[in-house]
Amino acid sequence: VAERQAGAAAPDTPGTRDTPGTPVASDTPDARASGAFDRDTAVALERSSDSEAVFAAEVSSDWRAGRGPHGGYLAAMLLRALSEGLSITTSGRSTGAPRSLTIHYLRAPDPGPVQIRVKLERAGRSLSTLSAQLERNGTPLALALAAFSVPWSAPEIADLPLPDVAPPDPVRESGRLLHPAAPPFTRHLILQPRIGAVPFEGSEQPMEIGGWLGLAEPRPVDALSLAFFSDALFSPPFLRLHEPGTSPTVDLTVHFRTSLPRVADPDPGELCFARFRTGIVHEGFFEEDGVIWAQDGTVLAQSRQLAILMALPKR
């Protein structure tokens, strides 16, 4: 399982070709920016064949959440490997933007080197599917399945408007962090809350949170950052708790709803708006449904995860 923890802001991922090396950020359009996010989600090709590519990567302690790395951080790392794997295993014949990513978190890896084994499950002219396994010394840590596709011709229908909230603050910075237990990954996040009560104060308001968010180091929004954002806010059930808790993610699905970048020269400092809702906490499990919008109201991504609501261990 991958984790999120107590930190929150106040309202107001035939032949063998060997290319060993140190993980480096991809040169693909989704990863041209430099900075901590691209450095710490970087992958390096170790070997490949017609149907498989194996990458080296490094799990950084800077993205820790609770007892393990942040789930959205691992999602971005896996998505980067899957995107690279599509190009490598099909020799560039299959293209398309990521449309769906599902991850099951098996074990929380400690910081250090890992491998990501990407397999081409199906290559189509329009839609391709790949799987990936994050592992260390042969032990699986996470399993992923992703679909990539070019746009299809269909009527444009939208019935999911951007919530009526105040625009982003003029100064690009986070709201006040409320709790000293805020995990390390929050240092990489800009969060300006707009929806939801203060966590861990036993609110009776709906389990709904939302706010403007982005990476602390300005970087154009792309599929990799959206994978991270899909798990970046504190869990909505935290609003109902009276004590800090943690919420390990069992599985996470992200649907990418538009091709990125949407313009030729995207603003690296632009924030997007994310809203997450929970309806049921039962037998320790809860669902979390999310939507991420661009500032012009375009839906960029939707997400859903199953997580476990847990109290922090007593010290």
Language model segments and positions:
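Terminal targeting signals and extreme-terminal segments of soluble enzymes
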Residues: 1-315
